[in-house]
From Swiss-Prot:
The active site is at 341. It is an enzyme of class 2 (transferase). It comes from the Bacteria. GO terms for cellular component: cytoplasm. One of its GO terms (biological process) is poly(3-hydroxyalkanoate) biosynthetic process. This is Poly(3-hydroxyalkanoate) polymerase. The gene is phaC. Residues 319-527 form the AB hydrolase-1 domain. Keywords: Acyltransferase, Cytoplasm, PHA biosynthesis, Transferase. It is found in: Cytoplasm. Belongs to the PHA/PHB synthase family. Its EC number is 2.3.1.-. It holds the Pfam family Abhydrolase_1. InterPro entries: AB_hydrolase_1 (IPR000073), AB_hydrolase_fold (IPR029058), PHA/PHB_synthase (IPR051321), PHA_synth_I (IPR010963), PhaC_N (IPR010941).
Length: 605
């Protein structure tokens, strides 16, 4: 049974008129806020960010989709067949709608997938008019997707970009986003006399002002979280700080710990506390509770001073310096290291460099949703061709970094229905403030990228794939992953669109030692932040080395219920089972500089 439908009360036109006048005034204020980046400052100069942020993306989208259209125009017969197919689909839909309007029951011509929440309200199916709108949108969208999929004469990168940009367009123009084509929004607007739009426009104005004229759609209540209290909660101490990172040592909760400490290298594209969201979801806290001395790098949120910090800088001043400081703090020369996402790519680069130079202090490596071979990289590869990278480099040259908002927008575009338009509708049309949610607080806590580092990463990994080809050079050393012989734990997640499971699987073959490939459920974040307990729902698969075809490995792998965290702990323990008395951070050769989570994590983009 669907949601019970009730007839709305008659609209209060006096209230609607009053709210319409107020809405016009708030709209005027919002328009003024959106023009702030274009206002003159001083002697007529434009404020930073005066160029329209989305212009380059719109130009690229237009060029890409035009190339697809041109391939169809070159084959009129095939284009006519496609148009005929679309016409037949709409004829069937119109016939079905007329039949429904005569009181008969008909099967829908097309339906949204069960996971599509946009059309969940009963009126989308019960009301013939809105059902027609919904099915028309779905038919046109699927026809457009098929046009891209079957276009001939375009390379796969262009096709991938076209699919990506088409997904953005279809998400933006969904009838669920607009009052007059969404029955639920229309009902609410009439019942409230437009007060929901008033609240929404006020939030839009606030978000434009907060973004300096650029719209930053709020996803959560940013005032609801405090570091050390609500997020990044595991106790510890900052025991070292340099220009690029703070090194945090976490306080033990067991009397003894594994002798070999663990260094976690998070990505610098976002902040480390995704691994320490709260006591229930903290991978860091859970590893501490198992008796591991955990160290974590907290990267600086860079500014113009860091423009020349490149991949080698992050290796030397990040991972290698952290290992040195761990030795000072604990007396241990050997460490286990774990890298997450691009932090894992940096860890792999460091391992290859150390293998070439005879420095072998990292005795085991764990990679969490990490790519070393970018042949089958995820949707972010859409932004990585020569033209787009040059445009990014030109933009970074202005200030020495890539703005955090641009990187955050790129990640949000990977899931536009969930991470963009659902919040646009909720905030600005329904007029509802988003709820407090720690994961979305972290998602909104953007970081900048130094120009030299980001350019190296885009060109050497996404564009030219030099690490996988044995062509990457760092510190005048050519890197060869086959020389990396340490045991490797390589975690992928089944639904990852950033580091696809296939990409991680094939990257496993690039290492020269034993690799334990593990496939967890869910995606890039939820598949990693998957604590043990009664709520552990995704499970994971193990099957030893990643050999042969990915599909064959999955079919033959053993499926396990629950979290992969205990499996990983056992793997670490097997590498070095010796235990020693627990180490108290800040009491040895390196005194505490600040309590965890430190100062760098608090820097805003």
């Amino acid at each position: 049974m669907g949601t019970e439908r009730t007839n709305p009360a008659a609209p209060d036109f006096e209230t609607i008129a009053r709210n319409a006048n107020q809405l016009a005034e708030v709209f005027r204020q919002s328009a003024a806020a959106s023009l702030k980046p274009f206002e003159p400052a001083g002697q007529g100069a434009l404020l930073p960010g005066a160029n329209l942020q989305g212009a380059s993306e719109i130009d690229e989208m237009t060029r890409t989709l035009t190339r697809v259209a041109e391939t169809w125009l070159k084959d009129p017969e095939k284009a006519l067949q496609a148009q005929t197919k679309l016409g037949q689909s709409f004829a069937a839909l119109w016939a079905s709608t007329l039949t429904r309007m005569q009181g008969a029951v008909t099967e829908p011509v097309v339906q949204p997938p069960p996971t599509d929440k946009r059309f969940a309200h009963a009126d989308w199916s019960a009301n013939p008019v809105f059902d027609l709108i919904k099915q028309s949108y779905l038919l046109l969208g699927r026809w457009a997707e098929e046009m891209v999929e079957t276009a001939e004469g375009i390379d796969e990168h262009t096709r991938h970009k076209a699919e990506f940009y088409l997904r953005q367009l279809l998400s933006a123009y969904s009838p669920s986003n607009f009052v007059m084509t969404n029955p639920e929004l229309l009902r609410q607007t009439l019942e409230e006399g437009g007060a929901n739009l008033m609240r929404g426009m006020k939030m839009l104005q606030e978000d434009l002002e907060a973004g300096g004229g650029q719209l930053r759609v709020r996803q959560t209540d940013l005032s609801a979280f405090t570091f050390g209290k609500d997020v990044a909660v595991t106790p510890g101490e900052v025991i070292f700080r340099n220009d690029l990172m703070e090194l945090i040592q976490y306080a033990p909760t067991t009397e003894t710990v594994l002798k070999r400490p663990l260094l976690i290298v998070p990505p610098w594209i976002n902040k480390f506390y995704i691994l320490d969201l709260n006591p229930q979801k903290s991978l860091i806290g859970w590893m501490v509770s198992q008796g591991i001395t955990v160290f974590v790098i907290s990267w600086v949120n860079p500014d113009e001073r860091h423009r020349d910090k490149d991949f080698e800088s992050y290796m030397r001043e990040g991972i290698e310096t952290a290992i040195d400081m761990i030795g000072v703090a604990t007396g241990e020369t050997d460490v286990a290291a774990a890298g997450y996402c691009v932090g894992g790519t940096l860890l792999a680069v460091t391992l290859a460099y150390q293998a070439a130079t005879g420095n072998r202090r990292i005795k085991s490596a764990t990679f969490l949703t990490t790519q070393v071979d970018f042949t089958h990289a995820g949707d972010l590869k859409v932004f990585a061709d020569e033209g787009q990278i040059k445009a990014i480099e030109e933009r970074m040259a202005e200030h020495g970094y890539l703005e955090g908002a641009r990187m955050a927008n790129a990640f949000n575009m990977l899931r536009p229905n969930d991470l963009i338009w659902s919040y646009v509708v909720n905030n600005y049309v329904r007029g509802k403030a988003p709820a407090a949610f720690d994961l979305l607080y972290w998602n909104a806590d953007a970081t900048r990228m130094p120009a030299a580092n980001h350019s190296f990463y885009l060109r050497n990994c996404y564009l030219n794939n030099t690490l996988a080809k044995g062509q990457m050079v760092l510190g005048n050393v050519r890197l060869d992953l086959k020389k990396v012989k340490v045991p490797v734990f390589n975690l992928a997640t089944r639904e990852d669109h950033i580091a696809p499971a296939l990409s991680v699987f094939e990257g496993s073959a690039k290492f020269g030692g034993k690799v334990d490939y593990v496939l967890a459920g869910s995606g890039h974040i939820a598949g990693v932040v998957a604590p043990p307990g009664p709520k552990a729902k995704y499970g994971f698969r193990t099957g030893g080395p990643a050999r042969g075809r990915f599909e064959d490995w999955v079919a033959a792998a053993t499926e396990h219920p629950g979290s992969w965290w205990p499996y990983w702990y056992k793997w670490l323990e097997e590498q070095a089972p010796e235990r020693v008395p627990a180490r108290i951070p800040g009491t040895g050769a390196l005194p505490s500089l600040a309590p965890a989570p430190g100062t760098y994590v608090r820097m805003k983009a």
